[in-house]
A protein has these predicted regions:
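Mixed-charge, Lys/Arg-enriched low-complexity segments
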Residues: 2-20, 60-85
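Acidic, low-complexity, intrinsically disordered interaction modules
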Residues: 20-71
Length: 85
């Protein structure tokens, strides 16, 4: 992996249609230049949202990155642990 150090908010901003309130819940951690995936960490749940530069959403698996539904993964990332019980 070749890590990018310049924050790229464009994929998150595009997927959230510029919803600043939700965007501010996230921290950009790094980008992977090899895969084109940006890693955003939710500031409360500490879960990661992985977005490709083209907007596709991924989760890390034992076999590498797997494409997943953005809406479903956004809910997973934002869901507080006590809400998921």
């Amino acid at each position: 992996m070749t890590a990018a150090t310049d924050a790229n908010w464009a994929p998150l901003e595009a997927r959230l249609n510029g919803d600043v309130e939700v965007i501010h819940e996230f921290m950009w951690m790094f980008g992977d230049k090899d895969t084109g995936v940006e890693y955003y960490k939710h500031s409360i749940t500490r879960r990661y949202l992985l977005l490709h530069r083209d907007g596709r959403c991924f989760q890390q698996s034992l076999n590498g990155l797997v494409e997943v539904d953005f809406g479903t993964d956004l809910r997973r990332v934002r869901e507080h642990p006590e809400e998921g019980r």
